[in-house]
Amino acid sequence: MKSLEEAQKFLEDHHVKYVLAQFVDIHGVAKVKSVPASHLNDILTTGAGFAGGAIWGTGIAPNGPDYMAIGELSTLSLIPWQPGYARLVCDGHVNGKPYEFDTRVVLKQQIARLAEKGWTLYTGLEPEFSLLKKDEHGAVHPFDDSDTLQKPCYDYKGITRHSPFLEKLTESLVEVGLDIYQIDHEDANGQFEINYTYADCLKSADDYIMFKMAASEIANELGIICSFMPKPFSNRPGNGMHMHMSIGDGKKSLFQDDSDPSGLGLSKLAYHFLGGILAHAPALAAVCAPTVNSYKRLVVGRSLSGATWAPAYIAYGNNNRSTLVRIPYGRLELRLPDGSCNPYLATAAVIAAGLDGVARELDPGTGRDDNLYDYSLEQLAEFGIGILPQNLGEALDALEADQVIMDAMGPGLSKEFVELKRMEWVDYMRHVSDWEINRYVQFY
């Protein structure tokens, strides 16, 4: 949409009665206000008002100013699974200015750094999710009782039994402009992935939030729990949000170089950007894998099906899914992020890390073509390959020690993020689990 008049006609033509003024909190969870369509201009000018203190991560006290969500007209779209509704993505404003605690605003700041060089970061985010249900005791299981194969990846029967959900989700997302190009059953029972075409990184993050909104609500209509939780089952692979990326100048990819002697098709710019990602990987873990549960996914070793698919090893390689960064020809795939991350914040942190690598001309070293799951920690250390933090506490330590990533987040947001995540870590460490009760009560 390019004008208010065009947008109003669009809403009238599609019988839209309400517009959801939507943004995300610090956790990447969608927040909305439902606004009658006749007041669209209000969202575009003054914004929809929210009590800032009621939103995670705003840093606004109960006696502080309102958080005003001002819509970006180009993001207006229908919500096909919710007839009569449209969605408008908003940026947070406080006292008339873009708010530095808003993660979409933070991403725009990093995008501006790229724009100064004439660059655009394009990303393709890959959503993995689990379709689940709870039994009468509250325990969680795959929704499909027949989905029990030890190696279920790409299973025909498994994907076919969920076709009502997958088809409605796909059709809804296509209607709002996502170019869905493949759907598959992943390597855990009840786990699926849907891929759609890449976009500039801001639109890509907007699309990912739309995907999660659609998947959760369409599943709910069918009595299914659609979860992006990183590791719902301890003995099965977890849910990632792999981030494919390349930088372009509006004419061509600046990451691709067919003369690359390594055969990976990467330019010097891509290698330096990659060097920055590897150098800042421990701190990136806190932002890209920001929950206690995230680190159940990022363990070293194998699973029942042969691999965890976890990117626990700080290395890169040609089409190597055992490394932190896989190299499909001419681009990077960062395998670290999971479905619990805030895509705006994760992307902003990745840009900051990559640009630091470019500024310092960091060398990522030689790529690894071997299966890193085969090696012990001692062998990996001999190779000079580090591993990611193995719990949220370690990741937060790495984040606080990394001034590049902290600066990219900004002083207020970084402080708020670390404080909230420290609270989560402490709550977890104080919790007495069933595992502990079963193991220790009678033993001692």
Curated annotation (Swiss-Prot):
GO terms for molecular function: ATP binding; glutamate-ethylamine ligase activity; glutamate-methylamine ligase activity; glutamine synthetase activity. Could be used for theanine (N(5)-ethyl-L-glutamine) production, by coupling the reaction with the ATP-regeneration system of yeast sugar fermentation. Theanine occurs naturally in the tea plant (Camellia sinensis) and provides flavor to green tea. It also has several favorable physiological effects on mammals. It catalyses: methylamine + L-glutamate + ATP = N(5)-methyl-L-glutamine + ADP + phosphate + H(+); ethylamine + L-glutamate + ATP = N(5)-ethyl-L-glutamine + ADP + phosphate + H(+). Catalyzes the formation of N(5)-methyl-L-glutamine from glutamate and methylamine. In vitro, can also use ethylamine, hydroxylamine and ammonia, with 75%, 40% and 1% activity compared to methylamine, respectively. Residues 103-444 form the GS catalytic domain. Pfam families: Gln-synt_C (PF00120). Formation of theanine is repressed by a high concentration of glutamic acid. This is Glutamate--methylamine ligase. Belongs to the glutamine synthetase family. Type 3 subfamily. Its EC number is 6.3.4.12, 6.3.1.6. Its cofactor is Mg(2+). Induction: By methylamine. Residues 14-97 form the GS beta-grasp domain. InterPro entries: Gln_synt_N, Gln_synt_N_sf, Gln_synth/guanido_kin_cat_dom, Gln_synth_cat_dom, Gln_synth_gly_rich_site, Glutamine_synthetase_typeIII. Keywords: ATP-binding, Ligase, Magnesium, Nucleotide-binding. SUPFAM superfamilies: Glutamine synthetase, N-terminal domain, Glutamine synthetase/guanido kinase. GO terms for biological process: glutamine biosynthetic process.
